[in-house]
A protein has these predicted regions:
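S-adenosylmethionine
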Residues: 1-446
């Protein structure tokens, strides 16, 4: 029988010590250990539970430990986090198992001195009538930070940018697994047929009401094993990204640039809007990412995509003039923390270099847009410095461009006042990842 807690600990250490991505580290561990469905689910719950609640868990450790948190060795700290998670946030794990298995885990890693320390803290928690008390509610940033396990600098950013009500609902939406969404490959099938085929494989599929040919999926297991996936009948893509391509409105025979394309999902969706007729140039700085795009296009039967190795921040006169340009730029990723909870702990989330890079990509890309064409600038983050401020500056400095009002589908609404050409999608208002989309057109120069 697999030692699931040890596997979870090793994944957490890889994420914390080596900067590994949670989804990749977890998937690799599940495959390497050949875990059953039940064991996979338990390991996933442990890993994501600790990542989603780390600030809360560390706050609880501080309240019970005489040793400062910074002086507790990393392995010991993560074993404590796992133990407290099971005691306070996982109802199906008996207290005795949470305590005993945590102590055994410490001994397995030759942490003999730490095993007694871990045992003492966990047993004190089990005996306490009030397990822990949150900080004073009057200090809103600290209170919300500990309650929802998000760093105070992000909490303050969202309160100042979106208002306290939006900020708290946004924070509350982060924990728990995000919905799996897919785009139906309309070159090979339709939504109703795909729903039936997925049902035959035990997958529950439901149409997303605010965008055509998009489905919510449940009970997928490993998506790559599904016959419908292998047959190229769909690709995984959140509804926010699908809306982004929808607003771009690519047409058959268009020439399109996808300037930061990898892993290619938006290019694939655009190709379907174009009925696989026209040209899409999918660009990235790294050759191995371009190979992923080519492989995905081949699986889906898409032939109108060509890949280009290039730096999107540099003007390229060799590129064709394009009818449609998609600038889905590198970003801090604050909108996808429900999928990658470790993002919140990164040290460089608020680097000034990132908005500057994004702006250079936008300006360089705009040079290739045809008069009368459309350009989408988008990110998967929730930070006005990377979103609204960049696009406002772009319009101020590019008089030959104008904002095109977005036609929002039923079920999609702005959470706060924005310009008609832009929307910040929020999980609590739209049921999507956090995402920013803006749409621009180009007029003839005077």
């Amino acid at each position: 029988m697999a030692n699931t807690r040890n596997i979870a600990l090793n994944v957490l250490l890889k994420i914390e010590n080596e900067g590994a991505y949670s989804n990749i580290a977890l998937n690799n561990a599940i495959k390497e250990n050949r875990l059953s469905g039940v064991d996979s689910s338990f390991v996933s719950a442990l890993v994501y539970g600790v990542l989603e609640r780390r600030i809360t868990l560390d706050y609880i450790i501080r309240s019970y430990s005489k040793i400062p948190l910074r002086k507790i060795e990393t392995k010991t700290k993560n074993i404590l986090r796992l133990g407290i998670l099971q005691l306070l946030f996982m109802d199906k794990v008996p207290d005795s198992a949470a305590v005993n298995e945590s102590v055994n885990l410490a001994k397995k890693h030759k942490l003999q001195k730490s095993s007694g320390f871990i045992n003492g803290i966990l047993r004190n928690i089990t005996r306490a009538e009030v397990k822990y008390t949150l900080p004073d509610e009057n200090d809103r940033a600290q209170y919300l930070s500990v309650k929802y396990s998000v760093p105070e600098n992000i909490v303050k950013l969202w309160i100042n940018s979106y208002g306290e009500n939006n900020a708290e609902q946004l924070l509350a939406s982060l924990n728990g697994r995000a919905k799996i969404c897919c785009r139906v490959n309309t070159l090979r099938t339709d939504a109703d047929t795909l729903i039936k085929k997925l049902s035959d494989e035990g997958v529950v599929a439901e149409k997303i009401p605010f965008i055509n040919n998009a489905l919510y999926l449940e009970n997928t297991g490993s998506v790559e094993r599904l016959r419908a996936y292998k047959s190229g009948l769909f690709h995984i893509q959140d509804a926010s990204s699908q809306l982004c391509v929808n607003f771009l409105d690519a047409k058959p025979r268009n020439i399109m640039l996808d300037v930061c394309s990898a892993p290619g999902g938006k290019s694939f969706s655009a190709a379907q809007y174009m009925s696989n007729r026209g040209r899409i140039f999918s660009c990235d700085m790294f050759d191995h990412k371009l190979k992923l795009i080519s492989a995905g296009a081949k699986r889906l039967g898409i032939t109108c995509i060509s890949t280009l190795l290039r730096d999107a921040s540099i003007n390229d006169t060799a590129l064709p003039v394009a009818d449609r340009i998609l600038c889905d730029v590198p970003c801090s990723g604050l909108g996808i923390m429900s999928r990658k909870p470790e993002i919140r702990y990164k040290d460089d989330l608020f680097s000034n270099d990132l908005p500057d890079l994004q702006y250079r990509i936008l300006c360089a890309s705009a040079d290739n847009l045809a008069v009368g064409g459309k350009l989408v600038y988008s990110t998967c983050t929730l930070n006005p410095d990377e979103n609204n401020k960049n696009t406002k500056r772009f319009l101020e400095e590019h008089p030959d461009f104008y904002g095109i009002p977005l036609k929002l589908p039923n079920g999609i609404a702005r959470a706060f006042d924005e310009e008609p050409y832009e929307i910040t999608l929020m999980p609590h208002t739209c049921g999507t990842d956090g995402f920013y989309i803006s749409l621009f057109g180009k007029k003839a120069s005077n």
